[in-house]
Regions:
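Regulatory sensory and allosteric helical modules in signal-transduction proteins
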Residues: 58, 62-110
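Short coil/loop residues immediately preceding or within conserved phosphate-binding loops
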Residues: 50, 112-115
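Conserved small/polar residues in nucleotide/adenosyl-binding loops
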Residues: 126-129
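Intrinsically disordered, low-complexity terminal regulatory regions
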Residues: 1-66
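A short, aliphatic-rich beta-strand micro-motif
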Residues: 114-122
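Residue-level recognition of short loop/turn positions
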Residues: 90, 123-124
């Protein structure tokens, strides 16, 4: 079943507070991880107009591109490399206001100027970006 997001323009905090329960409802009855990642990425992109939003999955000890919204992205990222690999290694959110100032930044797109990487960790998987 298709869903329609209902987000009023406001400050980011209000928009997140409105969006989160809608995402929970959207993915609540779906058991397929890939389908849920696809809808979460689409909801974030649609609501906030981010340049790129998406996920990477850990497969064979590297990050492999998963559902995303935005321009073409790097397909594989090594553990501890770039912003995503570093966030995975350190198991923490990393906010990079200027990607040119991040040591070892991987330029998947020259148009990307900043990044926020949030590791999403479950019992058997780590999903990023």
């Amino acid at each position: 079943m298709a869903e329609e997001l209902r987000i009023k323009n406001g400050d980011k905090q209000e928009m997140y507070e409105t969006l989160l329960p809608q995402i929970a409802s959207l993915v609540g009855n779906e058991t397929d991880l890939i389908a849920n990642m696809a809808n979460i990425a689409a909801a974030l992109k649609q609501t906030f107009g981010f340049f790129w939003v998406g996920f990477y999955r850990v497969i064979d000890n590297q990050l492999v591109l998963a559902p995303f919204q935005g321009p073409i992205a790097c397909t594989r990222i090594k553990y501890g490399k770039g912003v995503c690999g570093t966030a995975w290694k350190e198991a923490r959110t990393i906010i990079v206001p200027d990607v040119d100032a991040f040591p070892g930044h991987i330029a998947c797109s020259s148009a990307s100027r900043s990044e926020i990487v949030v590791p999403v960790i479950s019992v058997s998987y780590t999903h990023l970006r």
